[in-house]
Curated annotation (Swiss-Prot):
Has both general peroxidase activity and dye-decolorizing activity. Can catalyze the oxidation of 2,2'-azino-bis(3-ethylbenzothiazoline-6-sulphonic acid) (ABTS), and the phenolic compounds guaiacol and catechol. Also decolorizes the anthraquinone dye reactive blue 19 (RB19). Its main location: cytoplasm. Its cofactor is heme b. It comes from Escherichia coli O157:H7. This is Dye-decolorizing peroxidase YfeX. Heme binds at H215. The gene is yfeX. Coiled coil: none annotated. GO terms for cellular component: cytosol. Belongs to the DyP-type peroxidase family.
Length: 299
């Protein structure tokens, strides 16, 4: 069985760092840097076992085709953006995702990543996420209630089982900026109708009682009676005095599942848009492919 990169399956991490970058040099330098970083990561994982450290190196479409010779990741493409600009694209070449129970360890690993990749990449965005009270989003609603639980279930959803991409996963990242003043002008009832759950108790509102535009309705999708599940590794980010929101991060064995949720949220299926756009907006978006650790080391 191909070994999955260690940042895909962990649950309940308390902190994360996401780094998106473009490639500056030759892909051979990127190959070598990826292996160097994987070796450094293994050293940190052994040094801090209680941190439950994990990380992922993933690649955008053009770079993956160059690295793999055009083999595998058939669903991978540049993030096109959705909703006629509501969900903009900021597609980059490389994504590095680091997560654990300790921000200090994450930061050390991020420094090691910068040393490993050096001048072969140009960092375009670096975001530090944190677990908030009771695993809630900054809106006050619990985030990720329907996230698959347990390693076996999460593996079933997030990891490609067999074939040339076995052990790999498709990744989507999207940074959302919240306007909490706008949210707080709404009554709690209106907020709950917008999300599709009660705010304090985190109870699902019955489908016939919540609007078609509620967030829950837009993303709780089924095909042939089976839910289009994803594994979320999202966290709040930002500063109290400035920009803040949710860094959305999803892994899935099928890019299809992620894309169908986005099409539904941004009105590209039936013209109805996710009501949470009333107080928050996405400002970035990128699709990536995370190969198995075995394949990463053999690039």
């Amino acid at each position: 069985m191909s070994q999955v990169q260690s940042g895909i399956l962990p649950e309940h991490c308390r902190a994360a760092i996401w780094i998106e970058a473009n490639v500056k040099g030759e892909v051979d330098a990127l190959r070598a840097a990826s292996k160097t970083f994987a070796d450094k990561l293994a050293t940190f994982e052994a040094k801090f076992p209680d941190a439950h450290l994990g990380a992922v190196v993933a690649f955008g479409n053009n770079i993956w085709r160059a690295l793999s010779g055009g083999v595998g990741a058939e669903e991978l493409k540049d993030f096109p953006g959705y909703g006629k600009g509501l969900a903009p694209t900021t597609q980059f070449d490389v994504l590095i995702h680091i997560l654990s129970l300790r921000h200090d360890v994450n930061f050390s690993v991020a420094q090691a990543a910068m040393e490993a990749f050096g001048d072969c990449i140009e960092v375009k965005e670096e975001i530090h996420g944190f677990r908030w009270v009771e695993e809630r989003d900054l809106s006050g609603f619990v985030d990720g209630t329907e996230n698959p639980a347990g390693e076996e279930t999460r593996r079933e959803v997030a990891v490609i089982k067999d074939g040339v991409d076995a052990g790999g996963s498709y990744v989507f990242v999207q940074r959302w900026e919240h306007n909490l003043k706008q949210l707080n002008r709404m009554s709690v009832h209106d907020q709950e109708m917008m999300i599709g759950r009660t705010k304090e108790a985190n109870e699902e509102i019955d489908g016939d009682e919540r609007p078609e535009t509620s967030h829950l309705t837009r993303v709780d999708l089924k095909e042939d009676g089976k839910g289009l599940k994803i594994v979320r590794q999202s966290l709040p980010y930002g500063t109290a005095s400035g920009t803040h929101g949710l860094y959305f991060c999803a892994y899935c064995a099928r890019l299809h599942n992620i894309e169908q949720q986005l099409l539904s949220m941004f009105g590209d299926t039936d013209g109805k848009r996710d009501a949470m756009l009333r107080f928050t907006k996405p400002v970035t978006g990128g699709y990536y492919f995370a190969p198995s650790l075995d394949k990463l080391m053999a690039l």
